[in-house]
Amino acid sequence: QAEDETSVPMAVEELLSMPTLEIQPIIFEQRYIPTEMCMRVARSSLRTPPPLPCSPKLYHGVHLFIFVHGFQGQSCDLRLFKNCISLLYPDTCCHLSEANERNTEGDIKDMGRRLADEVRAKVDEWCATEASLARISFVVHSLGGLITRAALPLLADFSSKFHSFISLSSPHLGYMHNANKIVEAGLWVLKKWKKSLSLQQLTMSDTKDPRDSCLYELSGNDSLRNFNHICLVSSFQDHYAPFESARVEVSEDTHADSKFGEVYSEMASRIFKSVDIAAVVRLDVIFKIAEKNLDSLIGRAAHIQFLECIPLMRMFVHTYTTFFR
């Protein structure tokens, strides 16, 4: 007698949480460990440093996450990342920044002021007293990373609450060394045609002397030192945010640049001058981008993947738990 098909249990699989190799990004991690730990690692003959701690420090109160979009972006751009955090850490409060939705072509410092005002408004709205605010973390994409850094000095009274600064392909050192000529041409057109001040600032063409530029001034802001965790995420495939700029690193090509190399190196040093380097994690992401089109050619496809690649986001919130709780 044939077996009744209705009685056969059906396998239930959640394929999204375990993506296939065709869509799973490849991620390389770089971080620093204290000298004394290096000595212990050397003595124990371990070839890799110990993993990041999984047990977070206990805290009481609200952990507020602020998500900041990039150039010509919208508040909903980072909604998928927000959803991943909210599902795994339901006690967190998440806000998608709206302060600069229609103003990303203006002055980065003005955008920072608007963001700071918005953060204060959310603290007042969600935290009845200052004591109920335990932590503030930022998840930023593209230009949003520089906008956030411009806002941090204006939030100095909350600096003891700063917890995680997660930067997704943000050009912290600008666009001085962009290898993609098509992107460079596009930037030139936007600067000339739309008179975009923020793009002038990103290319350090807003002043004659680069040391008077907005980006150089911003590099002297030491507010990042107040964060317990700083994560700089980058991709070689993304030409909208140059690789070294997103990682705040100085390459050999930069040292060889007689025009901007010295200024570029100074900016990188100034950003990390007061930062505990053990708090910094750099992630290099390689996306599976199958389709060959203009977006993949100019690097826009990878830039957008930071907003759309759910496997990357899920890996992030499950692996780096101390960033989120």
Protein language model regions, located:
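Lipid deacylating catalytic domains
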Residues: 1-17, 21-139, 143-325
